[in-house]
Amino acid sequence: MIISHFYDWQKLPDSMTEDLMAEFNWHGAKYLTINGHQLAEHVDDASGYLRNFGAHMRAQHLETRDAHAPAGDSWDLNIVDPDQRRKIFKVHSMFLEMLADMGVHTYTMHVGTRDYMPPHCSELPPLRRLAEEMLELLLPVAEKNQIILAVENSFEAPNAPDEVVGLVERFKSPWLRCCFDAGHACRMADFEGRDLSLYRPGYIEESWHGHIILEKDAYAKMKPFTVTAHLHDNNGYSDQHKLAFDGCIDWHKLLSELRDTPSLFSIQNEMAHSKHHIPVGRACEAFAAIEDFFATGVLNTKTDHEHRFQTVISTLLKNGEN
């Protein structure tokens, strides 16, 4: 199982990149995810930037197998503007070719929500068709470069699990699959005690045209098609991107389902380091526990520090008894 880590590499000066990569390596990480902000900020010099970033990774004995496409108003599958659509097809194609040379196997993409929300307020059917048309163009490029396009669930109507799965089912291509985002699914989960008033004011009207659809089990819908998963946590109402185990997700239940997914290629730590200021070591410990769970079926989220502390205390108590 590939365990890969996001980081806001675009916020670091190049001179510090390898220093931080060394931290990931020291704490047992083997893979890093190329994030969409990195790509979006280096469209004009992507080849040189990615070549340099890859050299930094190799120097610290790290690799990449997963990338996230740039996302948002100018990048998503269903954007309406014809000129921008032509542009992003060319740029996504360029990225796929370059990322293939780095060993990337999955390229996560957002369906998109800009033109569904005010002031545009497009309806779902035409946006769905636009997403299909973009995928029709990109899938031959993905196949040529042996990279799977992984469409991701989010928390707006165009990105709901049914929409994401619908795209995959319509194409029936091995080069189009799902990226399951655990934090996004948690935000849309129909859990006991859900209080719609705790969402951001205006969220339901803007992102769902007033008719929100909560999910009893989003992963059950996406499981047959899932090749990668973005793991992060939250309070159930905001996309906080906390570290796994720091929010309200039932991780034992979710990880058990992921462990039982034959098509799963990788899981990715999408915690927002620069937002929550979580040390690299702590993030790596959390995902080492997840990796152990995949191997053993036993989930132990205590950190190495806690284990060492308990070992010292146990030894002292034992010596005291003697």
Region locations from a protein language model:
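Acidic/histidine-rich catalytic cores of soluble enzymes
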Residues: 32, 135-248
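N-terminal pre-domain/capping segments
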Residues: 1-104, 136, 173, 177, ...
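C-terminal/domain-terminus segments
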Residues: 240-265, 282-284
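Acidic-and-aromatic substrate-binding clefts and catalytic sites of carbohydrate-active enzymes
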Residues: 7-17, 35-50, 75-78, 114-120, ...
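Short beta-strand segments at enzyme active-site cores
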Residues: 34, 64-69, 104-112, 149-151, ...
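Active-site acidic/histidine proton-transfer and metal-coordination neighborhood
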Residues: 19, 56-59, 77-180, 187
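Short acidic/histidine-rich active-site segments
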Residues: 231-232, 265-274
